[in-house]
Amino acid sequence: MTTSLQDGQSAAGRAAARDSPLAAQVCGAAQGRGDARDLAPAPWLHARALLPPPDATRGCAADRRKKKDLDVLEMPSIPNPFPELCCSPFTSVLSAGLFPKANSRKKQVIKVYSEDETSRALEVPSDITARDVCQLLILKNHYIDDHSWTLFEHLPHVGLERTIEDHELVIEVLSNWGMEEENKLYFRKNYAKYEFFKNPMYFFPEHMVSFATETNGEISPTQILQMFLSSSTYPEIHGFLHAKEQGKKSWKKIYFLLRRSGLYFSTKGTSKEPRHLQFFSEFGNSDIYVSLAGKKKHGAPTNYGFCFKPNKAGGPRDLKMLCAEEEQSRTCWVTAIRLLKYGMQLYQNYMHPYQGRSGYSSQSISPMRSISENSRVAMDFSGQKTRVIENPTEALSVAVEEGLAWRKKGCLRLGSHGSPTASSQSSATSMAIHRSQPWFHHKMSREEAQRLIIQQGLVDGVFLVRDSQSNPKTFVLSMSHGQKIKHFQIIPVEDDGEMFHTLDDGHTRFTDLIQLVEFYQLNKGVLPCKLKHYCARIAL
């Protein structure tokens, strides 16, 4: 595992480092580490030519000398017409161009699924990584690369799933599957994959973190994260978990302790003394999975389950099932195990999209508007002379009016023959405009919405809009905040014969759902946070 960061970090990388509260500290901690793989000899150094036996060598030496002398006497010396080519540095280049080397990378066909169960077959080299597969699918489907696309390993027979880390070899993951297992690779967004680098305070609760040595003063979540990435000291994660007893269906509540060497449990209450700690699992030869339906599949006390599964193919008996009391506790355990298993490699995966972009500005790191759009200004053409609108409030009102005009034109196009009335425009607006938006999900239940948000990451601001199941002809905004999912009813309000949508009992009104979503993407309002990432179902 590579444990060093590149020194010559680009401007985009430094900008990303400033956004992360940990970047400056981690970059300093990563210096001075080497990679032993850089010193590995080339494969051709290990090959040995087949030598003839010593007796045969001595017996043929005299014959070769005689034959050489005869050849020299019989054949006259012919001058070389192109002496400059004998020592030309381009000779090897020409030879390589005329006789290309055979590609030694074997290719295999893999099948990748999306949320709607559509799939796509890809022919990939045997050494392709999960990041490269995601990039290939992004290019083939013309998606926007916002660095949240992720490859998942899905095990339906045991109800488990895990994030395949960006640096992992996909073919190696597939080689660990059993012949009769119907496992799948899923391609979807995961906004929470590296969220702990941006907001570590949500991932390490104070009551779950302790330190082997005494510390001076309070330790911040950023410092805790830095300790996970260092090689000297590691924090300890502790707390009660439900563990499934081997070979039984029963679960037992035990006090667990996570250390660098592995996961332990106490045989005597909450004691951390070595004589009371018993080894439970290590990280090197196993992967951490999240349980999708723990109660139904494994009879767990809660649905916040996770487990250790050996890398090699094995049955359900090899699983070490655990279960937390709440989502925040499970997230803390899983995140800490990932950090202890991969260490600095995770930080390198997080920083990889921002490195090596010296030829680009910081605006090219994330999907943004083009320079031509950013340079536009609001203009007023109503008077005799055109003028630039410098007042931001006036400019905003103009933009809203233009948006409403665009929506009315869309309603006219959606109407039937002839000029539609105001009521038909209103119905067309409510029925058709939001249907084309990726954040809107028609006829989605509350349970399906929660499952989709959890799949794409419990990050603050992840949201979707859906039809209300309890109140027909109304809508619900489902969003994530504080690692919990909240649902807000979008209430219809009528004023002077026109219908509006509101979240705050009519104090803020919107003519359609698009305007409502755009407003709360810029303003917190009555919501716990702004809307940041929408959940969308893609088709491959």
Swiss-Prot record:
Role according to the record: Adapter protein which modulates coupling of cell surface receptor kinases with specific signaling pathways. Binds to, and suppresses signals from, the activated insulin receptor (INSR). Potent inhibitor of insulin-stimulated MAPK3 phosphorylation. Plays a critical role regulating PDPK1 membrane translocation in response to insulin stimulation and serves as an adapter protein to recruit PDPK1 to activated insulin receptor, thus promoting PKB/AKT1 phosphorylation and transduction of the insulin signal.
Any one GO CC term of the record: cytoplasm
SUPFAM superfamilies given in the database record: PH domain-like, SH2 domain, Ubiquitin-like
Subcellular location as annotated: Cytoplasm; Endosome membrane
Name of protein: Growth factor receptor-bound protein 14
Taxonomy of the source species: Eukaryota, Metazoa, Chordata, Craniata, Vertebrata
Phosphoserine: residues bearing it: S372, S375
GO BP annotations listed: insulin receptor signaling pathway; negative regulation of insulin receptor signaling pathway
Location of N-acetylthreonine modifications: T2
Major location category of this protein: cytoplasm
Family: Belongs to the GRB7/10/14 family.
Domain PH: 234-342
Entry-linked InterPro entries: BPS-dom, GRB/APBB1IP, Grb14_SH2, PH-like_dom_sf, PH_APBB1IP, PH_domain, RA_dom, SH2
Its membrane topology: Peripheral membrane protein
Annotated spans, Disordered: 1-23
Domain Ras-associating: 106-192
Subunit structure: Interacts with the cytoplasmic domain of the autophosphorylated insulin receptor, through the SH2 domain. Interacts with GRB14 (via BPS domain); this interaction protects the tyrosines in the activation loop on INSR from dephosphorylation. Binds to the ankyrin repeat region of TNKS2 via its N-terminus. Interacts with activated NRAS. Interacts (via SH2 domain) with TEK/TIE2 (tyrosine phosphorylated).
Pfam family, one: BPS
Entry keyword set: Acetylation, Cytoplasm, Endosome, Membrane, Phosphoprotein, SH2 domain
